[in-house]
Structure formats: C-alpha cells, structure tokens
Amino acid sequence: MTKGAAADQDRAIAWARDNGINFFDTAASYGNGTSEVNLGRALNGNTDGIVVSTKVGLSNDDLSDIAGSITRSLDASLTRLKLDHVEIFQLHNTLGHSNSQGMLNFEQVMDEVIPAFERLKKAGKVRFLGFTAKGDTDDLHKLVECGSFNSAQIFYNLLVPSAGETVPDNYPSDDFRKLIDVALDSGVGAIGVRVLAGGALSGNENRHPLGMPSVAPIGSETDYSTDVQRARQFIPLIEAGYAASLPELAIRYVISNPVLPTTEIGIATLEELQQAAAAVNKGPLSDDALAQIKKIQAAFVA
C-alpha cells in the first residue's frame, strides 16, 4: 500500500478485516515509510483481533551503530503506524559474507541485532521477533535454529519450491533446503512470502501501475522476464481447468503445503485482495494438479 487513493486503501483494509484476514505486514522500506503511514491511517489505532508486523533494514551506513539504528527505525515505524507497539518486528536484511549493500553476516545478527531486538521486546515495543529468510542458506538454517526468533518469512512459490521440498542440485533458483520444515522443527513460525514471485506468476511482464516498478528475479538467476517466461509454463494447468488463473494456481499451490501455517500475499488493489481471498477459499490443489506442477518444475533444470 504505497500508491493509490487513500479511500481505496482504507476500503481494502476494512474489507480484509471484515473477511477474517488478521495479519498485516509492512516495512520501513516500503515506499520509504509510505506503506506504514497508509496502514496506520487505515487502522487508526484499532488493532483488535489483528497482528501488525513491520521490519527494519540496515544499510551499510547503519553498521557503525546497529543497535541505535534499529531503535530509531522502530520508533519511526511506530510513529507512522500510530501504534505504541507491533506484534512482530523483523530483520529485513540479506544474510551473507560480502560487503554488499544491505548484507549482514551471521555473527552481526547474533552479536548485535538480536540483543537490540531483545531490548525493544523488554521495553514493550514488540512482542515477537522475526526475520526475512533471504541470503546464505546455511546461515538461514542456523538462524532459525538459534532459539532467538519467533518467526521467519520464507520465500515459497511455484518457481522457488525448495523451502518446502527437495530440489535437484542444479535447480535454477535458491535452494532453501526445506527451510519451512527446519523452522517448524525449531519452534519458529513459518510465513510463506513471495507467493506470486514478485508478480511474475501473473504471467504478465507489464508491472501493475500501483505496484513496484521493477523487481529482482526471484524464480530464476537471470531476470524478471525469465521469471515470467517460466511462470507461463504453468498455463496448461489453467487450460486444463485446475485453476482459473495463474495467480490462483500460485496461491493454491502454496496453501497446498500441509505444514505451512501462514501465507502472506502482496496486493495493490481491493480487487487483487478479493481475488486472492477467493483463491484461498477454493482450497488446496488436487493431487493430480500437484503432480503436473512437479513435472513442469523438473523441466526448469538445465
């Protein structure tokens, strides 16, 4: 919710609440705080029965004062959200071992991020601690197993199924090595994200005018166009009647995972929200559809 008319955004939030959707996730970086401002306006302090989560992403300039940067980011987020606390506060950085912008190593998270998060929890500003699981898979596994986090946002979709199932070594996307199961075995709540692969699973290369103008490839190691081309390989399942559209197929694929407790879907309009809810209400895909999907995914391997 970074673009569009305020009245339309308010209607989308109201519709979501009226229809049993109770998890609202945002981040300081979404629209440079605009998403938080819009969500705060729509909620107007009324969080009865819902979970609000936000995230902090540290830049290289923040690394000299990680604890202070985290605290300042959360305080600014709470001001924009018009709240005195959030249910879940999440780290929004890539884990790795380079000096790339926005990348943290495992030791920085353990030694500096987690203590800062714990202090904010003790102060009553957050209830639960989480992180976005992107980056080095070994580090992500260690992080969900470290005992300090309550939740992890995990990439999982038709193009990137590895968080939920074993894929070949040469599968052309990140291999998260069944991170969903690892998280749940460690007592960490798994939240499925990037369900539509940043929009690629719409099958349309043209970005929605209210969405992000561009995204990095999620389902391939090449570019967004390649992601879209791979997404179109699932169109025969639509033609065969397994789902009414590619987005519906993508959403129902994710909720077909029997152990994934929560799925998060990014939306730009009320219409997209209603379509996503309708897809969820249709339930998991049939076993035959899932078998056809596995065959298509296997063909992605070079």
List where the protein language model places each region:
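Active-site mouth loops of central-metabolism enzymes
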Residues: 1-7, 56-68
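N-terminal binding-site loop/beta-alpha segment at the start of enzyme catalytic domains
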Residues: 1-51
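Acidic (Asp/Glu)-rich catalytic clusters
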Residues: 17-18, 40-48, 78-83, 144-147, ...
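A structural motif
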Residues: 18-21, 83-86, 126, 149, ...
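Alpha-helix-loop-beta-strand connector modules within alpha/beta enzyme cores
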Residues: 36-54, 110-123
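A short, structured active-site edge motif that brings together acidic residues
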Residues: 49-61, 91, 158-159
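Active-site groove signature of glycoside hydrolases
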Residues: 78-103
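Beta/alpha (TIM)-barrel catalytic core signal, keyed to glycine-rich beta->alpha loops juxtaposed to Asp/Glu
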Residues: 94-301
